[in-house]
Amino acid sequence: MTILLTGGIGSGKSSVRRILERMGVPCYDADSAVKGFYGVPLKSESEHLASGTTEKPFLLPEIEAALGLSFRKIDGSFDSRKLADAIFSDSGRLKTVESIVFPALATDFARCRKTVGQTVPGAVSSAVERPAGATPLADLAIFESATALDKPDFPKLWDKCIWVDAPEDLRVERVIARDHCSREQVLSRIRLQPPLEAHRSEVDAVILNDCSLQDLPMRVRSALSSTIPIRIKP
């Protein structure tokens, strides 16, 4: 079983994912995986693990050929700003890039699922018990993506969905601290993302991430145990 972990910018999805990883639940971060597709070096071992594998298809040449544009810096490395400027101002270009990236994500995720025991440490955790007839932990994985629910062409890779939410002011505060941008810039990004209400019928559980990191694991366990038939040890 695969659970989609999603939510708006600044909601704290990555914090929830790291808690799930510590519990031994295999997790896949689609955003980190896509960086690998563009040839961006991942910053840490945890980012390598979250993206599933370091062996990513290099999609940048295919994207450049499809759009007839170059997205490289002078040194030949990927220029994310050039790509963003090109696709977010042209829906046709965006759809072209998505038609290349989305199938690659599905294939990469499937490959990672097959090797989950080697890819994610602690894939069998003492924090999770499996009652009779419940989902085996080895068959459970988290697919983290901020945009999967918003994209009609995104492959339906998940069986259940957990949404991470937080009050808007807290989300703004987190993103300003992380990205060193202005309040107005953060609010404009938030406005571009559909809220929870737009996807309520597709969401199986909500984690309200407005608490301390010490209290958050309890909320994560509660959401996970209400979504699938596994019993979480206190």
Question: What do these predicted regions represent?
Answer:
Residues 5:
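Hydrophobic anchor at the beta1->P-loop junction of P-loop NTPases
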Residues 11:
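ATP-binding Walker
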Residues 14:
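Walker A/P-loop
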Residues 25-39:
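Short beta-strand-centered segment that lines the nucleotide-binding/catalytic pocket of NTP-utilizing
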Residues 36-120, 136-137:
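ATP-dependent small-molecule kinase phosphotransfer cores
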Residues 109, 150-151, 155-156, 177-228, ...:
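Small-molecule kinase domains that catalyze NTP-dependent phosphoryl transfer to phosphate-bearing small molecules
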Residues 110-113, 136-174:
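ATP-dependent NMP and nucleoside kinases share a basic, alpha-helical "lid"
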